[in-house]
Every structure is written in structure tokens, then in C-alpha cells.
Amino acid sequence: MRRLKLAALMLCLSQPVVAAAPPPPGTGIDAAIAAPSRSADNVKLDESRKPAEVLKFFGLRPGMHVIDLFGANRYWAEIIAPAVGPKGHVLVWEPTQFYKPDTKTAFEAFAAKTPNVSIISTPFEAPTLPRNSADFAMLNLDYHDTYWESQKYGIPHMEPAAFLKTLYAAMKPGGIVGVIDHVANPNSDTRATVERLHRIDPEVAKADFKRAGFQLVGESDILRNPADDHNLLVFDPKIRGKTDRFIFKFRKPR
């Protein structure tokens, strides 16, 4: 019996070792962030924006069709386009008020070498997005601007509900909207706070999206900063790039 056991053991040891199957390929987010083709100015923002953690939290995957709102600066598009791959697509929407000639030139050069990227530019007060088209939308540090008006920049008084109605219609059932914005103190006058500080109370943003029909399916503290007391303009050098920011993950019901 002992000889039989020994023979069986030797037979097992003589068999070739089969390597464990490699894990399924990831989203490509890390590789996209490390790509040398990214603009140097955008790479500098990574430390404060933590794009890998953010996009993984939102669930970005290859093949997704993405809307990058206010995205002509290319920060997110440079990462998302390679991450979603050739079967995915990134549609950037940029308000005409912000789509200045230098921004347009830089974006067109980027799009010329990135075949899965395109752009739509319409007035801020009249966003145009293809209906039922997006698996994911990124809204980074700009939702508060739907409460903003500026004679200098040609931005009229707007109703955030109208903006969200357009966004809701653009999302596929089950589509995810990732919202990041600068935190304002609670119970403040939203329009006055946006005008003065370019911040928004997280509960206001949350309520707006819920009224528009979206479901809140996740929150993250990746970009929270307890040292920010929410009283400085977000462009103030003392806090710029270090503001306390909320992250909400909304879904259009299936």
C-alpha cells in the first residue's frame, strides 16, 4: 500500500504544473493614466483629482459610451477614451461660452488622433445630447454652474432642472452619472453661494438629481478635505486644487 501511495505521489509530481488562469483584463484605467500621450498640464492635476480611484468607483469599463460634460479641457477624455477602448466612445459636451479658440484648437488636435472621441458645443442654456446614448456621464466640478449666471461670460439665468432633464434623456436605462463638486456649507442660498464661492451644498445637488428621476447608488469620500472650511472661493490660491469635494454616483432606473 505504501508503494502504491508513493507511486501515486510521484505521478502527481511528474505532471506539468498548470499556471492559474490570469485574472480577467481590467478596465485599462491605470494604463490610460500612465500613458505618455497625456497633456502635461492635465497630468499635474492627478494628485488632487485621483482619477484611478474615482473612475473605478464609478465603474468605468471597456466598451462604454460616455458623455464628458464640460470636457473640452480633455482631462477626463484623455483617460476615458483609451480606457473604454475602440468599442467605446467619448462624447464631450462643451458650452459655446467656454469653447474658446485656443481650447478648440487643442481639442481638435487631440480628437484627430483619438478616433473614439467627438464633441458637441451648444449654448450653456441649451445643452444638446443624443437621447438614450450613454452608459456613463462624467460631471466634474461643474454642476454648481447650472445655478450661475454671468453677464461677462454670456450665461443667462438657468434652471438646473432643465439641464438635468436633458441629461436624464441622454442616459441609457441603468446608465451611471458621476458627479463631483466643491462642497458648500449647508442651508445657504444656493445661487448666492455659487456666485460668491462656486460651491454647492451636497444635499441640494442630491435632491436635484433625485427630482430629475435619478437614483443615488453610491457616495465616496475619496476627495473629502476636512481642512477646507467651505468659506473660500474655489479659485483662491489658498484652497485651489484642495477643496473639500463630494462624489455622488447616480443611476437612471432600468
Could you say what each language-model-derived stretch is?
Residues 63-72:
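Conserved class I S-adenosyl-L-methionine
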Residues 212, 227-254:
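Core SAM-dependent methyltransferase catalytic element
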Residues 102-131:
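S-adenosyl-L-methionine
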Residues 189-216:
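Conserved Class I S-adenosyl-L-methionine
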Residues 64, 127-141:
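A short acidic, Gly/Pro-enriched loop at the edge of an enzyme's catalytic core
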Residues 29-57, 61:
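Class I SAM-dependent methyltransferase Rossmann-like catalytic core
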Residues 62-63, 86-87, 171-177:
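Short glycine-dipeptide loop
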Residues 81-82, 154-173:
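A short glycine-rich, Lys/Arg-flanked "PGG" loop and its adjoining helix->strand segment in the class I
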